Amino acid sequence: KSHGYSFYGELTYSEDYTHFNYVNPDAPKGGEISLAVSGSFDSMNPYTRKGRAGALSTVMYESLMGEQLAGTGLLPADAYGELYGLVAHTVEYPESKDWVIFHMRPEATFSDGSPVTAHDVLFSHNLLLDEGLKSYAEAIRKRIPSAEVIDDHTIKFTFSKDFSRRTMIEQVGTIPIWSKAWYEKTGAKLDESRLEISPGSGPYIIKDVDVNRSVTVERNPDYWGWDLPINKGRHNFDRIRVEYFADTTAAFEAFKAGEVTYRTESDPKNWASAYDFPAMDRGHVIKEELRDGSPPPMSGIVFNLGSDPLKDKRVRQAVALAYNF
């Protein structure tokens, strides 16, 4: 039994950890952060290919083991390949990893006040198999032949011995947990586009959805997990607002005009030359590089060998010689 799981050995944080090292556990809470994105949306269900889901449409859902909001990565950010209990307080598994048992926190509740139970976890797992992407369902059925509720706050997953089991604890530990009662009451389908939002157990709730214009979420004052070590120093904004714009140029202009308050710049050319506008000159905009210590994602250049220049073997050889390895 353990309070977390690591792909690579010992956990960085002990069972009695109080917060992650990179957070301020006493960080002030309040205010609003607004972000700009380009594009449009017509749904708040990101688990289907039908329609286009809005920003923050997963922000209210939690999992047994901790993930960053909206599925942006595992927690903690300073310990790669590690997971710590969120809705589950303990994870239990043998050395062979043939199975895993999650022991859940009885105090966990959905935003409508109903308890989060192992029945909801099993329902969510089965819903993904029955109504999720077919490719996902086919792969998971082969790897997880059975899942069973032991009691209201304990669930067991059994893994196939025909596949590597190292990542399977992460797989089942990070599936979103949905309310079984809500789905049964409303008849909602996971594979259908919809704007109706099921209750989640997370620190934020969807406050307002203006299709193709904005999505606003607010901190839930009744959130059950504020005092958990995994949440200390996090979820500090009272409101997060995402504004939609027709394209990236319009989104940048909105930032320059002060309509949105935060922007992540990924274009080197913009970073070097586009930040010369009145608000910047007045000191109302802080331009700062943030060090990212996480392992970089894989990137590459893909050549279209059907193009006329690359049909020439000598050109391909010249391109290969340009690389210093």
Model-derived segments and spans:
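N-terminal lobe/hinge region of extracytoplasmic solute-binding protein
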Residues: 2-96, 126, 199
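Short, well-ordered beta-strand elements
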Residues: 2-4, 30-39, 89, 99-102, ...
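Aromatic- and charge-enriched surface segment that lines or borders ligand/interaction sites
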Residues: 13, 23, 27-28, 48-56, ...
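Surface-exposed binding/hinge segments that line
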Residues: 103, 137-184, 203-210, 306-311
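Short, solvent-exposed loop/turn elements at domain surfaces
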Residues: 26, 42-48, 55, 72-75, ...
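Extracellular/periplasmic solute-recognition and catalytic clefts
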Residues: 146-148, 207-218, 243-307, 318
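Gly/Pro-rich hinge or "lid" segments in bacterial periplasmic/extracellular proteins
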Residues: 60-85, 171-241, 246-250
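Alpha-helical secondary-structure segments
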Residues: 34, 117-124, 152-158, 202-203, ...
